[in-house]
C-alpha cells in the first residue's frame, strides 16, 4: 500500500518562483540546521550554535499571534520545498514602520531571496499599510546588499565599525524601502478598491 501523500502546504502569498506560508513546527529541526550553517550564521552575525531546543523557543515566540511581527516560511514554488524563513519584526502600526529579516537556508544565489524580499515588502505596504521598512546588513555581504537593492531597498546610512565577523571589524549598512517608491505589487489587485 502506498504511503499517504503529505498535504500541500498552506500558501499565503505566491510569486513567480517562491511562495510564503506560515511557519511550521515540524520544521524546527530544519530551521536549526539552517541557522547553524557557517554561511547563514556568518551572514546573521551569529556566534552561538543553535540547538533544536533553542530554535523551538524562537518558533514558539514567532508563531504567536502578535500585531508586532509577521513571520513566513519560504517555499520554492515549483517543488514546494521549504528553503528559508523571512518576516517583519518591530511592526509599529501607528508610525507605519517595521524591520525586515530573511534567512535562506537553501538555494542561495538564484534570485529567490530578491523575490522573497519583494513579496514581504508588498505584504508590508499593501496588506499592512506600512510606510517604511528597514533592515541592517553587514557591509561585506555584497550579495545581500545587491538583493535588497533589487527588491527596492536603498542605503540610508552606516554604523561605522559596528560589527565584528571572524575577528575583523565591518560597517553595518542601514537600508530602507518606502511605500511610495515600491513598484510591481502582486498583491495590489487583491485589495478592494
Where are these regions (language model features)?
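GNAT-family acyltransferases
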Residues: 1-107, 169-170, 177-193
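Structural motif
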Residues: 38-39, 128, 151
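Conserved G/P- and acidic residue-centered "switch" motifs that form tight phosphate/ATP-binding loops
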Residues: 80, 111, 141, 167
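Conserved acetyl-CoA-binding loop-helix of GNAT-fold acetyltransferases
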Residues: 110-124, 142-150
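Conserved GNAT acetyl-CoA-binding A-motif
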Residues: 126-136
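Conserved beta-strand-loop-alpha-helix junction that forms the acyl-donor binding cleft
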Residues: 135-145, 162-166
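Conserved active-site tyrosine of GNAT-family acetyltransferases
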Residues: 148, 153, 175
Amino acid at each position: 500500500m502506498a504511503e499517504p501523500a503529505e498535504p500541500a502546504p498552506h500558501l499565503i502569498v505566491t510569486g513567480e518562483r517562491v511562495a510564503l506560508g506560515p511557519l511550521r513546527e515540524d520544521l524546527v529541526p530544519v530551521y536549526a540546521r539552517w541557522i547553524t550553517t557557517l554561511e547563514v550564521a556568518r551572514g546573521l552575525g551569529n556566534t552561538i550554535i543553535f540547538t533544536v531546543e533553542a530554535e523551538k523557543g524562537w518558533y514558539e515566540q514567532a508563531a504567536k499571534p502578535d500585531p508586532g511581527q509577521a513571520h513566513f516560511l519560504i517555499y520554492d514554488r515549483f517543488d514546494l520545498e521549504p528553503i528559508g524563513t523571512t518576516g517583519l519584526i518591530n511592526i509599529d502600526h501607528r508610525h507605519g514602520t517595521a524591520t525586515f529579516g530573511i534567512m535562506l537556508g537553501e538555494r542561495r544565489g538564484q534570485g529567490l531571496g530578491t523575490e522573497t524580499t519583494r513579496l514581504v515588502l508588498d505584504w508590508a505596504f499593501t496588506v499592512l499599510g506600512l510606510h517604511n521598512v528597514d533592515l541592517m546588513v553587514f557591509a561585506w555581504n555584497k550579495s545581500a546588499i545587491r538583493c535588497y537593492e533589487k527588491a527596492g531597498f536603498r542605503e540610508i546610512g552606516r554604523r561605522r565599525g559596528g560589527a565584528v565577523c571572524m575577528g575583523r571589524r565591518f560597517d553595518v549598512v542601514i537600508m530602507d524601502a518606502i511605500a511610495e517608491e515600491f513598484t510591481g505589487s502582486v498583491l495590489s489587485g487583491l485589495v478592494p478598491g
